[in-house]
Amino acid sequence: MQPTPINLPVGEFDDIAGLASRITPISPVDDFYLIDTALTKPQVDPSTWSLSIDGEYVDNPISYTYEELLNRDLVEREVTLSCVSNPVGGDLVDNAIWTGIPVTELLDEAGVQDPTNDQHQFFSRSVDGFTCGFPLPLAYDGRTAMLALMMNGEPLPIDHGFPARLVIAGLYGYVSATKWIERISVTDWIGVDGFWQPRGWSKEGPVKTQSRIDVPVSGSTVNSGSVAIGGVAWSPTIGIEQVEISIEDANVVRANEAFSEDFWEPVQLANTESDETWVQWRHDWDATPGEWVMRVRATDKTGFTQSPFPVAPAPDGAEGYHTTVVRVV
């Protein structure tokens, strides 16, 4: 399959002042976040590279060349990825269109044993030695679990893992997003750890439900009258049911040394490709002069609403409401 250029879609809420420059439905490749353990990005020659699939629970170990993988029937999926080190309100989350091969096809060709056994691990290795893993059944539960060869219609850039990388919806990258991949092994879950577990990060890494205010930017000044507020929320594989915003007088919050829970109201959500992507949201606010504190929270499609209590990113992802302050004149 040859790369096909993709015209990135226009966001439903791009009319919000400043939003399109900060967040779009599909993240341009050059703007997609980068977090790696590799100080120097591996330069892989696709003519000599291969991907091997093996392990204790594989009956027929197999390997594939880059050309063999490109010549297969490829699928295209839109998936949001995020980093476990992303703080509340942070920008280490992006959305792209990925093209590649479902890993289940490759595992089945290798004769994987008992794919529903949660004591078996999908364990991957990069050419630079990075390793990570997740429970094998997650590759088979219907989520996008892909060996990606293209990103937004073009071959993977070197920075994003050329010639191939993993894209697993709903898992933080530290347990799933192996770039420059060279090996997939089906191993035991217990006793086989990836790069980050000895360094204090959790063995499992499901993405937590999150939301963010992108505009107006915290600390900015806006004119009174109609002000459009916008941002994103995400809970890949589960999906976002509702996003709410609370806007309070900053002086009252300071005087009470607490927030009120009386001001939450739902916002408008944009359409999404699937539950594996982030969703843009907007709220039109009749702003009056003063200093205002904004908070946002999301509820996913299981009915779970974000916790207001701050939790640091380590060891398994940040929690809390993204909070901003703006001045209206």
Residue ranges and their predicted role:
Residues 2-329:
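Structured, non-membrane catalytic/scaffold regions adjacent to prosthetic-group chemistry
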